[in-house]
Amino acid sequence: MYNARSEPLDRAPMSAANEALIRRFYDAFARRDAEAMAACYHPDARFSDPAFPALQGAEIGDMWRMLCSRAQQFSLEYSKVQASGERGSAHWEPRYLFSKTGRMVHNIIDAQFRFADGLIIEHKDHFDFWRWSRQALGAPGLLLGWSGFLRAKVQAEAAKGLSLYRSKRA
């Protein structure tokens, strides 16, 4: 037998649990509760987005701790939460002050998830880097946001910032 999403009925409870996990994650994010966010991830989890392309394990929780601790004029809305027994997705839109430039950013992000043992094992955030860079960086983002050069520079700065944050926590 199948439910309304054409899944076997024995997978329906897992779908509901994974959907609740995604909602718990974004509710925690809206409160800037990085500890609750980190608790949603499997110890072997992997994360990627245009700024942090390859985080794993404890790096993910530390990224959220760093971002939540620095967040200014922050708000978050999320929608379109869906989950199956193995995969999920959500749409989310944070608004925040980018501290390096003092510019307001409204990012539009689509997230994809995979689950294992009732936790997030893989999380990929997709957003338009050029759009983000125009808002966050102003003229440099407008002129170079499409280029691999600027993306690599942002990734290097993000990695350096996370490494420094992690060394201070240790």
Would you name each region that the model predicts?
Residues 34-38, 42-88:
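A solvent-exposed, acidic/Ser-Thr-rich amphipathic alpha-helical stretch
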Residues 1-39, 43, 157-170:
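Short, low-complexity N-terminal intrinsically disordered segments enriched in polar/charged residues
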Residues 17, 59, 105:
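Soluble or luminal CAZymes and related metallo-dependent hydrolases
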Residues 11-15, 53, 102:
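Alpha-helix initiation/capping motif
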Residues 2-10, 68-77, 82-170:
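A beta-strand edge to alpha-helix "cap/lid" segment located at domain peripheries
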Residues 22-25, 37-38, 45, 60, ...:
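Hydrophobic pocket/interface hotspot
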